[in-house]
Swiss-Prot record:
Belongs to the enolase family. Catalyzes the reversible conversion of 2-phosphoglycerate (2-PG) into phosphoenolpyruvate (PEP). It is essential for the degradation of carbohydrates via glycolysis. GO terms for biological process: glycolytic process. This is Enolase. It comes from Prochlorococcus marinus (strain MIT 9312). The active site is at residues 209, 339.
Amino acid sequence: MKETIDFLIDTIEARQVLDSRGNPTVEAEVFLECGASGRAIVPSGASTGAHEAHELRDGGSKYMGKGVLNAVNKIHETISPALCGLSALDQTTVDKLMIEIDGTFNKSNLGANSILAVSLATARASANALDVPLYRYLGDPLSNLLPVPLMNVINGGAHAPNSLDFQEFMLVPHGVQNFSESLRMGTEIFHSLKSLLDKKGLSTAVGDEGGFAPNLSSSEEAGDLLLEAIQKAGFIPGEQVSLALDAASTEFYSDGIYKYEGKSLNSSEMISYLSRLVSNYPIVSIEDGLAEDDWEGWSELNKELGNKVQLVGDDLFVTNTERLRKGIMEKSANSILIKVNQIGTLTETLEAIELAKTSGFTSVISHRSGETEDTTIADLSVATRSGQIKTGSLSRSERIAKYNRLLKIEEELGNQARFAGALGLGPKNI
């Protein structure tokens, strides 16, 4: 084992780079005394929950106000001097010190984007110094579970310029023995779907997450297209490939009413509609079926559908343990979406995953619509044995990078690798 001094943080560099939407984001690089280093780039969301940690942006005219030079300066002028000399192996101390220096409930002083970039880069530097893969460093020798992918192949809502209110229509290829076969199934269905859209004269342009963005009239039309594409590719809906939805309901909710497909629905009516979809399609997971602060509605939704499908809180929980505890107490869902930039540190992310696990909730590790080439979430999904990952469609390199990383992890693990779909450890009831 190397001397402890080798793992001390020597310097931290940061810079402004671009994400997949052409918007600025923060990259941090942590250098250790031993010469090892780690780099991380943070993502950014389009449909952001009101309770997410604060992203620091510059304002002004450059990059339409979305520059992050202020966040970069916070790293150079405040975070780096405070962390230099600390052990990179002590992730909790590193993260808690940044939280303490920030001093706000939502990280609005230093910015969650600057804090997270340093947090993730610190973990990667430690893994590199120890010469182990990130998933092994964050996990343990039993971290060998490859996740079921939830593949967003039809985009709507805030992710696409079309008339669909629901944000994501996903494939869940689970009925195989390993991740690589699951990825192959999803890819073949993706190309099958493109062919169908072409034949129907519908757009094959893709949205922010790489899925198609055809101008469909309803969620049912999207569901029918997916079933047709699954069968056209030679697979069995429900048995080999199921469906998942991200309604992102907060985006069309106001004053207790859901403005959905030209109708005004209250919570009970929205729940009834979701229940009909579950009855008519092989849906195994619904994310943000109701709005982020419709707590009473969420409890009713869980009573109605919680024993049938996975009910995932994204905007509801925002990877925050306090909101998750409330959801557990009120029985508001049975799953949490994990987005590292919603909470802003690796330590808090791992705490949320652990709380979910000990409370009988599933966890879905997730990307953001504004992504980068960073593949941390692929390693995180294996490290935590979450069993599920959302990282977009089967196009756009920032999405494919995560899938390719998972292929490499599966190859590294060899016969030790296990696939969550084959073990029934993905979404509920697959």
